[in-house]
């Protein structure tokens, strides 16, 4: 990808272009003399991408996330193949109104790094963190040599979206290797997995029905309808179901060209059926459990869907989980 | 058949999830149900945290259909729901709402309620837990509890539980609280009794324990060696609007606020670290604080340590206000206090010699509840003698409402050649740092009651010991031959001069909120 693919209007939205060596001074000036703004920060949130077409949407995403999670936001667009090498930076305040008069603001520093290497990315990130605050990185690119030990050993939370990976099998291997490194101590939050949260919650609700619960052992099949490009989410969901049931149900995946990432989940067996369905444009999901003559229906809120909302949701969950890592070998085997 | 665990529940939640449950609200046509309880349950549903196959039954005297009841509640929800009102969600949620008409003293009505609950269980395919919420007037608690017992509804079906949630006021003195506790104990075990105090459901109240016990910098200083005194203020800028004078004039600030809400805050500030976070470990430590309060016995001790007052005509925010005795539904000869300030001592090693000043009042200049912990001054401050430093001790302020947060006042050097020292404030605001709105106190407390976590509910001994302490003061005020004076303050001021004198006598003053 070359620098020429950079869109001037996208760059213009990043705020005030500032020489990298003067970022701290420029940030200070940004706040000086404006008593109506309160600066707040609880985390460092960095987005790393190698796709210049994502610059505008990532910029919007940070604006959305910062409204709920006060942060020092870093947006890094790395274009390793681009020549000649050049590094540019922009600063801006992400503000939201507070009590009518004041604005609560987070800082965003954006970088476009052309022709740089892994060390340059690390230096840039580590030089501009708000000290003592946790570092959350959403690594949007593939886990290549830029994602290396000296970098991930400093990360507290790594956000990925495995459904974006062009070669999921290879990327899952790279992820597992990083997670098993001696110095790695980061939580992994996979947005592909987060997207299934509402389905999992609804499924739990489905089988809270006493009659259906008694028939769990009779379940035989899983049928998941998902949006094209969200196969990993469907696979992760299927692995989770099999793990929970300690079995291996027959899996059928149905791909659709439009609609929500996950559209329906049906578990079926002799005399028992649990269905979770989310219709297009609905913020709710329909849950239906049938067991012989007995039928139970419910309406539950659907989880958020956009990347910004998913990231925001993840930042609200500070507890890590070993569940995801325990599923990786199974997902990896299904990708063979 | 042994009960199966739902394998899909595990791994999903960071908190204990409630199992299928029916909530029965007694006094369902009242203000609390419309303004707080149903909007709280609706918001729990909107967050997806409501247990599956949930039902709520409104129990009251008036004749209504399910549909009529739902329509009334919908109106209340539109006005009061924290997350707004969604017609689609309400449409589904409303199906779980039912109405049951009965007199509180009519056993047949309770038997019919039992049949309705059984019918729900049949529809569910299994028995569910039952939570009885007493939102009726306190005088109705006794007949309701007796009828619940007589109808056999106080026992869960199979291995399911039956619990009761009691709204405040829990008694009006020690004798009535004990009487009520006895009735409750005849019907429900203490572990199934949840006495609600909505202050404990507030995010900042819950944060007091986290602040104290998760931060190593505070706890070593949290004692009489480093803390000079503690102030707890609960100010309201309203009077007796909306007809509340009728109830309030029978209670007063001491019974209405201090015995429950402010004592709960006091115990959270003063308690020893619990051995764990189980409900009883936390409540064991809280009750020790109440027991250690130095009793104020007799009019002299009460007069010296407690200031009561009524407001006279004045203005708040530029709006004229009548005096307390001129308020709607207030006795013109009333001896009830809408303001009280107390100096309390806690006789423990940790708090020896550290006064806790509490004040609560109506028609004060602003609405605010906060705790301020005033640290001792260093033995010597060699820098400056400015009058600006008169009240320059480090102060940790925990704002309960509004603008929830924590502030720490410290001293810093002013820029310049001279060694001038200036107070600065490090301020943490929940709303600035966490964009998401906190759940309403009732949402948290209802979910806790459904999930069986009693940590944020008052235990019997807590309530009775608090009343025991309060009764001595009430006795000195109303039953002694030489009762302490009822002072006055103009509406819109920070209370009577005598409340200021209470601290001034100790060389201190109230924090300016």
Task: Give the residues covered by each predicted segment.
Chain B
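Secretory/organelle targeting and membrane-embedding segments
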Residues: 1-166, 170-513
